């Protein structure tokens, strides 16, 4: 009870193939693979963009003002 044997998964796979057909499943697999590939490329380019951009504190021409807040009256 609670755990599925290999035969349960085989039956589920057969039912899914009968309902959707192999062509539809292949198209879904291609779409899913393309989405994963696009996501990985996006993450890779995001990492490269972050490495090329200097942090805000290290940008040239900026200045830091050290002050304390004034009391409101």
Curated annotation (Swiss-Prot):
Report whether Ion transport shows up as a keyword of the record: no
Localization, UniProt:
Cell inner membrane
Give Gene Ontology CC terms. TAT protein transport complex
| Statement: the UniProt record of this protein carries the keyword Membrane | yes
UniProt-listed GO biological process terms: protein transport by the Tat complex
Keyword field:
Cell inner membrane, Cell membrane, Membrane, Protein transport, Translocation, Transmembrane, Transmembrane helix, Transport
Which family is it part of?
Belongs to the TatA/E family.
Q: What is this protein called?
A: Sec-independent protein translocase protein TatA
| Organism field | Laribacter hongkongensis (strain HLHK9)
Which gene specifies this protein's sequence? tatA
């Amino acid at each position: 009870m609670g755990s599925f044997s290999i035969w349960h998964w085989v039956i589920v796979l057969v039912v899914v193939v009968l309902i959707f057909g192999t062509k539809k499943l292949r198209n879904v697999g291609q779409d899913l693979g393309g989405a994963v590939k696009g996501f990985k490329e996006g993450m890779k380019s995001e990492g490269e963009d972050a490495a090329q951009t200097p942090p805000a504190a290290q940008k040239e021409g900026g200045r830091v003002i050290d002050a304390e807040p004034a009391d409101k009256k």
